[in-house]
């Protein structure tokens, strides 16, 4: 005799109403679109903060971990296309894992921004290692610049003041070898290289109109207008740019986490009622 009982609503089953079949066919694309809408903007914000040219110096590159989120979304999409029905583990993984990754990174960036904005604004040059190291690097650059100005003043007869108005550290003959620690032939000339520190300090002077590091001082690389110490400028970027954007990521992900939990609780009984294994 004919078997009675709930029929599993598998896509393509001729016994099922067209609406239900269409809903199942649409599910993989709809779920993937929800994931893209939820996670694409926070992912972009985290990457933008991490790659910011001012923040980069103090930031580890762990933020690139967020690039695994599109991979998770694609894998979950492929599972749903292959199975033809919502798969509980895939749904939970596709919604919760990217959320936690972004929440963690947003939180780390927020706490880092609060810490750095305070310590960089402080007049204490020793508030943390990175700040102290950059001050030493700036002092090394100033020493080179000062010697260079003195030597040029002796050779040309021009006053130090006039030379300091027009002459910049990169105009000094020995600048490149001290910067890289290498001679023109590529042999080691100095014990250390200043490439990372001096490139960063030069970028700040040329693009953020500052001079000196811990305190406002002689501009070494740029001739543009300047009014603040570069550490104050970086502190402001952490406070006015990094902190609010990182906070935004955290708020978005906490809201999404709550909405996801509610959806999963409500979705279970509905899917089971339609004969799906959930």
Predicted features, each with a name:
Residues 1-159, 164-168, 175-178, 183-278:
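Membrane-proximal loop-to-helix boundary features in eukaryotic membrane proteins
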């Amino acid at each position: 005799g004919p078997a009675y009982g709930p029929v599993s609503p598998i896509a393509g089953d001729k016994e099922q109403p067209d609406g239900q079949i269409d809903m199942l066919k649409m599910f993989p694309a709809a779920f993937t679109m929800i994931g893209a809408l939820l996670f694409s903007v926070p992912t972009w914000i985290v990457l933008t903060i991490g790659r910011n040219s001012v923040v980069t110096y103090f930031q580890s590159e762990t933020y690139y971990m967020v690039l695994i989120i599109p991979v998770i979304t694609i894998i979950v999409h492929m599972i749903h296309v292959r199975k033809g029905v919502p798969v509980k583990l895939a749904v939970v993984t596709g919604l919760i894992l990217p959320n936690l990754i972004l929440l963690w990174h947003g939180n780390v960036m927020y706490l880092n921004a609060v810490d750095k904005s305070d310590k960089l604004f402080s007049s204490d040059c020793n508030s943390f290692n990175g700040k102290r190291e950059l001050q030493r690097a700036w002092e090394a650059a100033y020493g080179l610049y000062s010697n260079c100005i003195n030597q040029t003043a002796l050779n040309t007869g021009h006053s130090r003041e006039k030379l300091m108005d027009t002459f910049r550290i990169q105009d000094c003959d020995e600048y490149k070898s001290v910067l890289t620690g290498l001679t023109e032939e590529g042999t080691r000339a100095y014990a250390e290289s200043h490439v990372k520190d001096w490139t960063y300090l030069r970028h700040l002077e040329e693009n953020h109109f500052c001079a000196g590091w811990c305190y406002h001082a002689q501009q070494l690389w740029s001739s543009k207008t300047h009014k603040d110490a570069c550490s104050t400028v970086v502190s402001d970027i952490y406070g006015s740019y990094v902190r609010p954007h990182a906070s935004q990521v955290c708020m978005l992900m906490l809201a999404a986490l709550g909405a996801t939990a509610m959806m999963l609780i409500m979705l279970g009984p509905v899917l089971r009622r339609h004969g799906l294994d959930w």
